Regions:
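Sec-dependent N-terminal signal peptides
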Residues: 4-15
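Glycine/tyrosine- and acidic-biased, solvent-exposed loop/turn segments at the edges of beta-strands
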Residues: 17-273
Length: 273
C-alpha cells in the first residue's frame, strides 16, 4: 500500500515540476510569459549589461541599464508602451546622450558640454567645439558651414557653390594655395585641389584624408570623420564614441564597449516582481 501511495505521489509531483518552469521571451518589443503578454518587473541583460524593466501587458513602461558598478548608464522612456526616447549617462553621472524619437538626438562631452545635435524636424545637424561654439552646421543635403573655434566662418557651401566672397587665395611655389581671410591664413589647398583648414592658432582643424573628411582636436587626434554614409565621433584620447552607418548607430563607453545600439540584444530574462 505504501508503494502504491509513493507511486501516486510521484505521478503528481512530476507534472507539477514540469509545469513549474516559466518561459520568458522578448520578441518584437513585447515581453511574453509562457506565450502570454507579461506584466511585472524583470531583470534582463541588454547588450551585455545588467538591466531592469517594468512591463504592463507585455509593453515596456520603463527600462534602466546599469554599469558594472551599479551606476545608471541608460534610461529608456515609454508612454503606454510606446518608445519615445532615451537618456545615456557617463560613469560620472553626466549626461552622454539624449534621443527623442523622430525629433532630435544630442551627444555631450563628459563635462556636460554639447558635442553634436541632430534635429530631424529641422533637418539640421550641428557639431560643436568644446567651448560651445559651432564647428560645422549642415542643413539638409545642400548647405554646410565650417567655423573655427572663435566662430569665424572658414567655408560656406550651398548647392555645391562656395559662398566665400571675402576669401582670397595666394599661389605658392609648389602649386598649392593659401586660403586667406581678413589678412590671415585660414587654410590651404594642395596642388591636387585638396583643402585643409586651420584653428585660429594654426593647428589643423579639418582635412581630407584618403577621401575621408576628418576634423581634429588641437592635440591632433581625430574628433569626427565622415566617409560617405558613415560618421564617427571620438573621445579626445582617440577612442571611438559614436558611429552611424545609414540607419544603424552605436554609442561606446571609454572602455570600448557598445552601450547602446539601434538594435538591442536582450537576453537572460528573469521576473523579480
Amino acid at each position: 500500500m505504501k508503494k502504491i501511495l509513493l507511486i501516486l505521489l510521484l505521478l503528481f509531483l512530476i507534472p507539477l515540476s514540469a509545469c513549474g518552469k516559466v518561459k520568458y521571451e522578448f520578441k518584437d518589443g513585447v515581453m511574453y510569459e509562457d506565450g502570454k503578454e507579461a506584466t511585472g518587473t524583470f531583470e534582463v541583460t541588454i547588450n551585455g549589461f545588467k538591466s531592469k524593466g517594468k512591463f504592463i501587458n507585455g509593453l515596456a513602461n520603463e527600462i534602466e541599464v546599469y554599469y558594472s558598478d551599479g551606476s545608471i548608464m541608460r534610461k529608456d522612456i515609454y508612454v503606454n508602451g510606446e518608445f519615445l526616447g532615451l537618456q545615456v549617462y557617463y560613469r560620472n553621472g553626466k549626461l552622454m546622450s539624449t534621443y527623442l524619437k523622430d525629433k532630435r538626438m544630442d551627444i555631450f562631452y563628459d563635462d556636460g558640454q554639447l558635442l553634436m545635435r541632430f534635429d530631424k524636424e529641422k533637418g539640421e545637424n550641428t557639431v560643436y567645439f568644446e567651448n560651445g561654439n559651432p564647428l560645422l552646421v549642415i542643413v539638409g543635403t545642400t548647405t554646410s558651414t565650417l567655423y573655427n573655434e572663435n566662430k569665424e566662418v572658414l567655408s560656406r557651401i550651398e548647392n555645391g557653390i562656395r559662398l566665400d566672397d571675402d576669401i582670397t587665395f595666394k599661389n605658392l611655389e609648389d602649386g598649392s594655395f593659401e586660403i586667406i581671410k581678413n589678412n590671415k591664413v585660414i587654410g590651404k589647398i594642395s596642388a591636387y585641389g585638396v583643402p585643409t583648414y586651420f584653428y585660429s592658432t594654426g593647428e589643423t582643424l579639418m582635412k581630407l584624408d584618403n577621401s575621408v573628411y576628418k576634423t581634429l582636436f588641437k592635440n591632433g587626434n581625430t574628433f569626427f570623420e565622415r566617409d560617405g554614409n558613415i560618421t564617427r565621433f571620438y573621445y579626445k584620447d582617440g577612442k571611438l564614441l559614436y558611429e552611424s552607418k545609414g540607419k544603424e548607430w552605436t554609442i561606446y563607453n571609454r572602455e570600448g564597449e557598445k552601450i547602446i545600439t539601434a538594435f538591442d540584444e536582450i537576453t537572460d530574462i528573469k521576473k523579480i516582481d
